[in-house]
Swiss-Prot record:
TM spans (from-to): 61-83
Functional note: Accessory subunit of the mitochondrial membrane respiratory chain NADH dehydrogenase (Complex I), that is believed not to be involved in catalysis. Complex I functions in the transfer of electrons from NADH to the respiratory chain. The immediate electron acceptor for the enzyme is believed to be ubiquinone.
Modification N6-acetyllysine, positions: 23
InterPro entries: NDUFB3
Family classification: Belongs to the complex I NDUFB3 subunit family.
A Pfam match: NDUF_B12
An example Gene Ontology biological process: mitochondrial respiratory chain complex I assembly
Modified sites of kind N6-succinyllysine: 23
Protein name (database record): NADH dehydrogenase [ubiquinone] 1 beta subcomplex subunit 3
Subcellular location as annotated: Mitochondrion inner membrane
Length: 98
């Protein structure tokens, strides 16, 4: 069997994001670094936590927001379920009367 025709079936190599894209400037981590620097210390892993303050992860989640997160889709599913139940019950009643 010939190999190397672009039809690999094994796991592909995962691409890791570039660590340089995460910056602590403008995040609460910057304050931590400044306080550590005042004591002559440095957090070499601070950049690893910067993703928490960027992009979609940066939004503050309120208690109400957490409770209502899936409400839209849940309510839509509820309406569909009630509609299906109503339809199936009406079909069952029609069969009993005939």
């Amino acid at each position: 069997m010939a190999h190397g025709h672009g039809h690999e079936h094994g796991p592909s190599k995962m691409e890791l994001p570039d660590y340089k894209q995460w910056k602590i400037e403008g995040t609460p981590l910057e304050t931590v670094q400044e306080k550590l620097a005042a004591r002559g210390l440095r957090d070499p892993w601070g950049r690893n936590e910067a993703w928490r303050y960027m992009g979609g992860f940066a939004n503050n989640v309120s208690f109400v927001g957490a409770l209502l997160k899936g409400f839209k889709w849940g309510f839509a599913a509820f309406v569909v379920a009630i509609g299906a139940e109503y339809y199936l019950e009406s079909q069952k009643k029609d069969k009993k009367h005939h």
